């Protein structure tokens, strides 16, 4: 039975494609997506989307139609789920994090452990930075029982990319439900401020501004300063994350840009993290839209909270409901949004 998805639904971006391909590949259900990225100024598939599609096709021996730059229709029919070692080259500064987002749910149910070596952009606009994936995404997924490790070899920024990341995924039988509406007691705030092919003071100023901004709000943060000179081009950024006594992790990040003061970058990341901490939720807005896939696949009722009901989140819930017999509940309680679903306890 083919699943038909209208790519112009909700936020109408690449997220619809990523979630649809991930669930199609995992469940072995063919999917046809039309009006892909219909609401974007450059509609249709772009190189980084094609990498995610072709990587999912490689892992599942899929038949695909419409996998070309600018295509607004894609047909994807998966066959056998493989595992092992795979090299994926995005070929541009396309986001490595977004490729991981597509492939992680598939590989958790693969027949054996998998190692992915991915080349592309590690810290680019409109995507979670790689340190967010390493320290927030991986830790939140571990609450569901997922075992994923992400190793950063080299950073890659826009426009040249060239970053390299190694991802290890251990297969599991079933994901377990997660029931955390409260963040818990704050244990520590950590961070990494990086600068590549730039003076050390850029990373130092980002870190200092982040720590000072958080200190004014009563938070203490330990931020590691990382400088490298092995990039294909210059770039900088900062990722902060807060951990609680019950294992919840939320993050805030910002990317350096030409002409943007380093202090502003650090302050922006700190303010984003503080805004989430203030609400006492268990998921930051970025993680909430990624978590719904795992909540639906897990065994039992999952209940989590986030600080914003973004269009990304609502769109992702809708896409998951097209593939799985689940119904999400999204309810506003004070400053929080409670996400609840009875997961199907998927197993291969």
Swiss-Prot record:
Binding residue positions for ATP: 101, 286-289
EC number: 6.5.1.4
Pfam families: RTC, RTC_insert
GO molecular function, one term: RNA-3'-phosphate cyclase activity
The entry's keywords: ATP-binding, Cytoplasm, Ligase, Nucleotide-binding
Name this polypeptide is given: RNA 3'-terminal phosphate cyclase
CDD domains tied to this protein: RNA_Cyclase_Class_II (cd00874)
Highest taxon, organism lineage: Archaea
Catalytic activity, as annotated: a 3'-end 3'-phospho-ribonucleotide-RNA + ATP = a 3'-end 2',3'-cyclophospho-ribonucleotide-RNA + AMP + diphosphate
Organism lineage string: Archaea, Thermoproteota, Thermoprotei, Thermoproteales, Thermoproteaceae
Gene Ontology CC annotations of this record: cytoplasm
Residues annotated as transmembrane: none
Compartmental location: Cytoplasm
UniProt record similarity statement: Belongs to the RNA 3'-terminal cyclase family. Type 1 subfamily.
Purpose: Catalyzes the conversion of 3'-phosphate to a 2',3'-cyclic phosphodiester at the end of RNA. The mechanism of action of the enzyme occurs in 3 steps: (A) adenylation of the enzyme by ATP; (B) transfer of adenylate to an RNA-N3'P to produce RNA-N3'PP5'A; (C) and attack of the adjacent 2'-hydroxyl on the 3'-phosphorus in the diester linkage to produce the cyclic end product. The biological role of this enzyme is unknown but it is likely to function in some aspects of cellular RNA processing.
Encoding gene per record: rtcA
Enzyme active site: 312 (tele-amp-histidine intermediate)
Entry-linked PANTHER family: RNA 3' TERMINAL PHOSPHATE CYCLASE, RNA 3'-TERMINAL PHOSPHATE CYCLASE
UniProt entry tagged with the keyword ATP-binding: yes
Statement: the UniProt record of this protein carries the keyword ATP-binding: yes
NCBIfam families membership: RNA_3prim_cycl
